[in-house]
Design a protein with these regions (language model features):
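Catalytic-site neighborhood detector that most strongly recognizes the C-terminal catalytic loop/helix
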Residues: 46-48, 68, 172, 180, ...
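Short functional hotspots where side chains directly engage DNA or cofactors
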Residues: 165-167, 203, 225-233, 278, ...
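Basic/aromatic DNA-contact patch characteristic of tyrosine site-specific recombinases
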Residues: 1-89, 97-101, 105, 118, ...
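Basic, Lys/Arg- and aromatic-enriched nucleic-acid-binding interface segment
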Residues: 25-26, 137-148, 156, 160-216, ...
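N-terminal core-binding DNA-recognition domain of tyrosine site-specific recombinases/integrases
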Residues: 23, 42-46, 73-78, 82-164, ...
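C-terminal secondary-structure termini that scaffold catalytic or DNA-interacting sites
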Residues: 220, 225, 234-260, 266, ...
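Short, basic (Lys/Arg/His-rich) helix/loop patches that form interaction surfaces
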Residues: 137, 187-197, 206, 254, ...
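Alpha-helix C-terminal capping/helix-coil junction sites
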Residues: 62-63, 111, 155, 203-204
Length: 374
């Protein structure tokens, strides 16, 4: 239970109210309570109504288990960002690097010296609104997401009662304009890449991320079953190679078309299980920047599309799989998406509209002539 003391007046021996030696000095009302650890706490207020409101919220928090210590949020956003990043070791190195960049570029310049407890929802909304126009809507959403994740961590650590970034209005997301190659375009691009054409075909028909391709070893290619086990990824972060699990931290089995399995055979048969399937010319990890600079970008300039990136071959793989009749769950498994919803959000427009097919099929079943039984 929280107690409220009047620091300017007290009751004398005769029961009458009399002034204290602190009369007229500082805040008049003092709220006292014990926190869940039994420590004595106190906070001063100028007005009695403020003290009563604070005491009521304290008692509610103590009873409900949602109590937040007054000094818990007196940590600067800059310091909290460092702690939060240190606690995200489960993230992929590339994701962690992107989060760090967002924090250093956008969050710390605005919030670095601000205490967590001083952040208001209105201030966050004003800040986010100010980013609109300077950044693309997807970038604004990423900045907000990182900031909100940091503050959610503070809520779980009992430093904030709620997340002031929740409910902030974001700009309408721009629909990504994915580009997809057809089979002939894949063949043309692969041909222009010469000996590295197999890399283009592999990405276009398996949908692996570049880091998954670069980390693929011989022991994870089963030519008989025509399967590739995606279990590892390698990412270049700040010029350094960082090995880890795939983006969703889950292994997956990806099918190989027969022609691609045959093309991989010389790269797999008779080699050590831990050898890289797609090494660089020097025998180490094939880095995407080097691949683009030496091979891919020149081929793209010849056959297009303009500015095409190796990652867009992953979109191509989804498109070709869907055109071949794969359903959403197959595409999800192939690409390693965490949920089918994510797959539909990205590629739902590529799935054919089969509503009429379903109606026609039901019509055939219901209206089929009865066949007399013998």
């Amino acid at each position: 239970v929280a107690d409220i003391d009047d620091r300017w007046y007290r009751r004398g021996p005769d029961g009458r109210r009399e002034k204290t030696e602190r009369h007229g000095q500082g805040a008049r009302w003092l709220v006292r309570w014990r926190d869940p650890q039994g420590r004595q706490r106190k906070k001063s207020f100028k007005r009695k109504a403020e003290a009563e409101s604070y005491a009521a919220s304290l008692e509610h928090g103590l009873r409900s288990g949602s109590y937040i210590a007054p000094d818990a949020g007196r940590v600067s956003v800059g310091e909290w960002a460092t702690r939060w990043l240190d606690g995200q070791a489960h993230l992929a190195p590339s994701t962690l690097a992107r989060y760090r960049d967002v924090i250093e570029t956008h969050i710390v310049p605005r919030w670095g010296s601000v205490h967590l407890s001083s952040i208001t929802h209105a201030d966050v909304q004003t800040w986010i609104s100010g980013l609109v126009g300077r950044l693309a809507s997807t970038s604004v959403a990423k900045v907000h997401r990182v900031f909100s994740l940091m503050l959610a961590w503070a809520v779980r650590d009992a430093r904030l009662a709620r997340n002031p970034a929740e409910g902030v209005r974001l700009p309408r997301p721009e629909q990504p304009e994915h580009r997809y190659l057809d089979h002939d375009q894949v063949a043309a691009l692969a041909e222009r890449c010469g000996d590295h054409g197999v890399v283009v075909r592999f990405l276009a028909y398996t949908g692996l991320r570049w880091g998954e391709l670069a980390a693929l070893t011989v022991g994870r290619v089963d030519l008989r079953r025509r399967r590739v086990l995606v279990a590892e990824s390698v990412t270049e972060v700040g010029g350094r190679l960082v090995w880890g699990s795939p983006k969703t931290h889950e292994r997956r089995s990806v099918p190989l078309p027969r022609f691609l399995a045959e093309e991989l055979r010389p790269r797999v048969e008779g080699r050590r299980a831990d050898a890289l399937v797609f090494p660089s010319p020097r025998g180490d990890v094939l880095r995407v920047r080097n691949f683009r600079r030496r091979v891919f970008d020149a081929a793209v300039r010849e056959v297009g599309p303009e500015g095409f990136h190796p990652h867009e071959l992953r979109h191509t793989a989804a498109s070709l799989a869907i055109a071949s009749g794969a359903d959403v769950k197959i595409v999800q498994q192939m690409l390693g998406h965490k949920t089918a919803t994510m797959t539909l959000d990205l590629y739902g427009h590529l799935f054919p509209d089969r509503l009429n097919d379903i109606a026609d099929r039901m019509d055939q079943i219901v209206c089929a002539p009865d066949v007399p039984r013998e």
